[in-house]
Amino acid sequence: MQTIIKATVFIKGNAVAAVMLTLLMATGIPQLSAQSADNEVPDLAGIWDGGFGARPVNGEHVPWGEENFPVLNERALAYQQVWEEIMAPKYDCQPASSPAIQYDPYHMELVQWPDRVMLRYEKDDQLRIVWLDGREPSSVDFSIQGFSVGHYEDGALLVETTHFVFDIAGFDDYNGIPSSSQLVVNERYWMD
């Protein structure tokens, strides 16, 4: 059984930009391949604005609200019912994980190299590396930010992150949706 949660987060940079997140909680982990020479590398480098109040949703370009709240399985619903925001690790100065860190009102710097992209979040001074060379994660690559691989396609950076450690507030630290080692986050970064 798998639960699919689709999410969209809007982020403003020098141009209008967006991040699309798709979360797949399943036992299988799909793999991304190394960057193809056929895809042009877009210039996404710079400071991106997280935007206050942005949230992932169950669909594209839809405001956050009860009618489009991410679909949760029975276990996640039970967990959410006992959740209180004061339980969030952020109140103990613990770093936020993706995707929760994406929609906090802080900036993110994106730096591009031929074999990797660095995402540096202003909040908690978190660093995240997106590998573009198709490498596989090892058994020790589990972390709060997970292990990210990506490639460029149609003027966008597509990122897939796996290997998260359990985080009590990993998906959404305001609504009590945890993440786990089975979490898969797919992101799309582009500028209009």
Set out the residue ranges of the language-model regions.
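N-terminal secretory signal peptides that target proteins for export/translocation
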Residues: 1-13
